[in-house]
């Protein structure tokens, strides 16, 4: 498609007319995108999904927990670093699967993710839980945690933490059943 002096809105207007019928006719999904297409600013996409091109089929989001872990003894949470979390409710992943997923995220994003689970009593267990024991109530309330939740955590400079959280969100969304709309 070629357009002279087109604005972003001009391009969207044309594509919103052209693409839905094509998606409906040739797409492999029963649900076609409808106009107007959802528009997400770069800042919102990075803060909410950890990516400037998020997979919106995944229902997981990225949450900021920088203020919640301020003053923690865990070195990656040191002052100046941004800390992001991806909460997965009712996650029954085994330790081996979690370790593999974290290794895959580290290879793809270049930064190591951390994790902990919420046990049946509401306490944190596994991964970095021992560094968060004094802030359990605050973190539980702020992130809306319930027993059975898995929390993937990333830390680093803002863009690195966001990027790693985005990769973690995508990997968790595809690995944990019920969080990716395949339709």
Residue ranges and their predicted role:
Residues 2-183:
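Class II aminoacyl-tRNA synthetase catalytic cores and aaRS-like
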């Amino acid at each position: 498609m070629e357009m002279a002096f087109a604005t972003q809105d001009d391009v969207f207007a044309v594509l919103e007319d052209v693409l839905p019928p094509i998606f409906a006719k040739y797409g492999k999904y029963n649900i076609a995108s409808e106009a107007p297409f959802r528009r997400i600013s770069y800042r919102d996409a990075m803060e909410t999904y950890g990516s400037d091109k998020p997979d919106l089929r995944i229902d997981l989001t990225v949450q900021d927990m920088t203020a919640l872990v301020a003053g923690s003894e865990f070195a990656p949470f040191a002052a100046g670093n941004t800390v992001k979390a991806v909460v997965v409710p009712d996650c029954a992943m085994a330790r081996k699967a979690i370790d593999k997923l974290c290794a895959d995220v580290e290879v793809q994003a270049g930064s190591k993710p951390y994790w902990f689970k919420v046990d049946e009593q509401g306490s944190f267990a596994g991964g970095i839980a021992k560094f968060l024991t004094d802030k359990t109530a605050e973190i539980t309330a702020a992130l809306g945690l319930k027993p059975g939740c898995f929390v993937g955590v990333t830390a680093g400079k803002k863009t690195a933490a966001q990027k790693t959280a985005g990769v973690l969100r995508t990997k968790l969304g595809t690995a944990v059943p019920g969080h990716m709309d395949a339709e």
